[in-house]
Amino acid sequence: MGLDLLSTYAPGIFDSLLTWKGVAGLVVAITLGYLIISRLPGQKSRPKLLDLKTGGISFEKVAAVYDDYDKSYGEGDHGELHVKDKNKVFQLANTFYDFVTDGYEWAWGSSFHFSQRMPGLSHAASQMLHESRMASFLRLKPGMKCLDVGCGVGNPGRTVASCSGAEVTGITINEYQIKRAEYHNKRTGLVGYFKPVVGNFCAMPFKDKTFDAAFAMDSTCHAPKLEDVYSEVFRVLKPGGLFATYEWVSTKDYDPNNSRHVKVMNSIIFGNGLPNIRSWKQAEDAGKNVGFKLVTSFDLATAPPVGKPWYYVPELMVKYGLLTIQKALVRGACNVGLLPNEGWKVCNMVADMVPNLVEGGATNIFTPMHLLIFEKPK
């Protein structure tokens, strides 16, 4: 994030800016921050504020599509949020990523996942370390064929291909993300090593027993049921193949009868386009139910203890008001017609979720990185 990058490349600047008073100080602070951030490594590949798009949604349809998104959710017996029509889950996910893909790259980067902040490493380097673990978990070697389930714009797939030599194919339901993935492939010289394909990961366009291994990073949470996507992964894996996934789940500390817990989880669901939230035990059982053998199951958020928590950067964003600045910039651009008139609602939807995301992590009722490793029996 901007603050995280400032803390890495320009220590002390942001803290000193925070002591300034008045509108002039705020303008100078934002300008300096923008100038510093825009010159940092990797920033030229990110969309700029006024370049933000809404995927396959035209500007004039943003308001109507957002209203449909909002109305897609209902509450269960305990007040927990869920998508009312399970047949529209993938349409919802596709709409969500049309809305947020450019915004994610602008505000977060091209790795659409969380990771612990490791000692001595920047935010981006910590993310790549988190991604590269997959190659080790799956025992990948040059020439092996690996599937990235729910690849987004492809950074995890490119990292895994780069550090393992394996041929990685990614699948995402969102066509705009395919365009962004292909752009990043050319930029990084990985055309031919990482191949993005558009498709539904619960009905994949691949033949049986195609891949030697598969992984998913913070993506299968969008499936209507985990069994739906796990069964497809099982089908396309060769016998003996491994499937590793970082799952967004509730932990053993989550209490569905605790109204505060439910409110926090509902915010995470709505602000991330999820159908609901599963528990870690439900995720384990889903893999077993489709025929996998469970090899490993533990919450990576609890280890190693030397790293800063996965919610460290979002916590800084909340603490220093960066979310408020982002919301103001987007609202201003919308008001003068540079972005869709109602586009600020999408920005607010995600930004207003972040404090609850931090609370979910800090209270240990939610984790985005429960590691499951499954094996398809030989």
Curated annotation (Swiss-Prot):
GO terms for biological process: methylation; steroid biosynthetic process. Its EC number is 2.1.1.262. One of its GO terms (molecular function) is S-adenosylmethionine-dependent methyltransferase activity. The chain crosses the membrane at residues 17-37. It is found in: Microsome membrane. It holds the Pfam family Methyltransf_11. This is Squalene methyltransferase 1. It comes from Botryococcus braunii.
